[in-house]
Amino acid sequence: MATREHELRPEQERLGEDREEYEDGEEEEEEGEEGWDDWESDGDDAGGGGGGGGLLCLFCSARFDSESSLFSHCASEHRFDFYRVVKETGMDFYGCIKLINFVRSKVAENKCWSCGQVFSSNSELCGHLHALEIPQLEGKVPWGDDVYLKPFLEDDSLLHSLSVFDDDDEDDCGMPMEKGGCSAGNGSLAETCESNLKSIINDGSDVIDRFERTCTIESTDGECSGSLAQEPSDKQLKIARASAAARGIKSVDESYFGSYSSFGIHREMLGDKVRTEAYRDALLGNPSLMNGATVLDVGCGTGILSLFAAKAGASRVIAVDGSAKMVSVATEVAKSNGFLYDENMEMQQKRDTQVITVVHTKAEELNHKIQVPSNKFDVLVSEWMGYCLLYESMLSSVLYARDHFLKPGGAILPDTATIFGAGFGKGGTSLPFWENVYGFDMSCIGKEVTGNSARFPVVDILASEDIVTETAVLNSFDLATMKENEMDFTSSFELRLSESGVSQSGVTWCYGIILWFDTGFTNRFCKEKPVNLSTSPFSTPTHWSQTIFTFEEPIAMAKEESAVVSSASVGTDECPAVMIRSRISIVRASEHRSIDISIETTGISSDGRKRSWPVQIFNL
């Protein structure tokens, strides 16, 4: 799947006395059946003990109008005394944020937040819940990781409503307020910070700079600055930055999913026969895997993979996509072809093929939208690959779905992926075109274009005859077992001139490195019909093309028997390199869904001399 759209350490704050007991929340939601036929969407109208309020309980679907009533309900119904935990652990504001997100994440996994025991359903979990033994923590809380600063639920109203740290103690200001103007100024400052914080949390506006200007400005009499302004600045800025980061991710995701809302990219992907037929053959050609299987399709798009799965005999298919437009389209497509599951239809009226349900959500939030039964899925299928394999970072969503929704021993399709690299010659650049444009020499333009290519990766299809070196394997991924951090890697490899790359003069110029990937539906899961999907320049072209990284200057190469001039620089006509030793690092970029690539290059001559070129950094 690819598109062409090219000090969180706050100071400790002291807590006052424990809060008073509040009104008990009402009864939790009734537990429903957990069979495959009873999946329901967890819409915004979820009922529960608190009626129609906006604050969702940490453990059940009850909603409340206030933080106090919610935590009173948690204490009485779920034995989770939030205020006691906060007081006894000495948590600051950020600790509270982390605790809430930690508990929500564990409950989503049907895991006890206190002892870690795992259950098959939310009802079993709620029946087990017990108070946390604070002394057993030995000073280290399990929610201490900064990862829990990121809201587990999108737009979690509870995080916006926390008042446990409302602070009326003048001592916390850091200096006495002797001037009347200071007192008034500080009140205005707090209001400004609160307003700006809400702006960041609610609409993702970039007002952090405004925070910093407001929180450090002196009062009109010039005598109220420094620590007085700094105290609210610290707390507000830190939560603002955390929230802004989360909003930045959300913004990129919205743009990403929005790019898949147009039909052009889907026409291109469906028309990619190599891609689509590989998935079709893997799903339809392995009946022992697919017949009667429950299937999760992550990033379903038009739903083509779900249709293949249903046609292959799957008993239930859940198709997930982050684009509301494509969810609507996939639903209509499934309905038009007689595969859409209708939960309102009587069982005797349903056909065996009516098995597909399409859900609008990210994979990471699936269990907030539907109730995933304890037996989970037999098969996870996804077309997640981007340019250079890892662009778009969709693999992390697939791995999350594998770890949370695929049953032990279940199949992930595809189950392997490999990145390859090779050196390419002049034909892989635009130089030949510019050297003869209707009989005119425009090579000056070609040189400028090639120079620009040395700063930006190019996604294009190269002809196999333009590959001048042997192929090297950069990295292989076992998608059934790999960890998310393995998406970031460094690979060292060597490139030697191939037989077909040798020119008549004996010297061949290598202009850069090209990367491509294969994915495998291996006989580990596809026993009847293993399939390999290749984006190699030696195979039929695909919509992924290849990813081209051009050197700042080309490197002359020759076979080992070539004579060299000892005084000449390695990689030149007089001293061609017999081998290029390269190290490539590919890591997820700070910009969500992008990747950074660094390339280190060293040429080695036949007499053993070496020459290294400056590191090149690319962003894709």
Swiss-Prot record:
Subcellular location: Cytoplasm, Cytosol
Function, as annotated: Protein-arginine N-methyltransferase that catalyzes both the monomethylation and asymmetric dimethylation of the guanidino nitrogens of arginine residues in target proteins, and therefore falls into the group of type I methyltransferases.
Active site residues of this protein: E383, E392
Record has Lipid metabolism as a keyword: no
Region of interest (Disordered), residue spans: 1-45
Name the UniProt record assigns to this protein: Probable protein arginine N-methyltransferase 3
Example GO biological process: methylation
UniProt note: domains: The C2H2-type zinc-finger is responsible for substrate specificity.
Protein's organism: Oryza sativa subsp. japonica
Catalysed transformations (reactions): L-arginyl-[protein] + S-adenosyl-L-methionine = N(omega)-methyl-L-arginyl-[protein] + S-adenosyl-L-homocysteine + H(+); L-arginyl-[protein] + 2 S-adenosyl-L-methionine = N(omega),N(omega)-dimethyl-L-arginyl-[protein] + 2 S-adenosyl-L-homocysteine + 2 H(+)
Compositional bias segments (type: Basic and acidic residues): 1-17
Family designation: Belongs to the class I-like SAM-binding methyltransferase superfamily. Protein arginine N-methyltransferase family.
Keywords, ordered alphabetically: Cytoplasm, Metal-binding, Methyltransferase, Repeat, S-adenosyl-L-methionine, Transferase, Zinc, Zinc-finger
Hydrolase among keywords: no
Zinc finger (C2H2-type): 55-78, 110-137
GO terms for MF: histone methyltransferase activity; protein-arginine N-methyltransferase activity; protein-arginine omega-N asymmetric methyltransferase activity; protein-arginine omega-N monomethyltransferase activity; transcription cis-regulatory region binding; zinc ion binding
InterPro entries: ANM3-like_C2H2_Zf, Arg_MeTrfase, Methyltransf_25, PRMT_dom, SAM-dependent_MTases_sf, Znf_C2H2_sf, Znf_C2H2_type
Residues where S-adenosyl-L-homocysteine binds: R275, G299, D321, S323, E364
Acidic residues: bias regions: 18-45
Enzyme Commission code: 2.1.1.319
Domain SAM-dependent MTase PRMT-type: 253-582
Pfam families xref list: ANM3_C2H2_Zf, Methyltransf_25, PRMT_C
PANTHER family in alphabetical order: PROTEIN ARGININE N-METHYLTRANSFERASE (PTHR11006), PROTEIN ARGININE N-METHYLTRANSFERASE 3-RELATED (PTHR11006:SF89)
GO cellular component terms, semicolon-separated: cytosol; nucleus
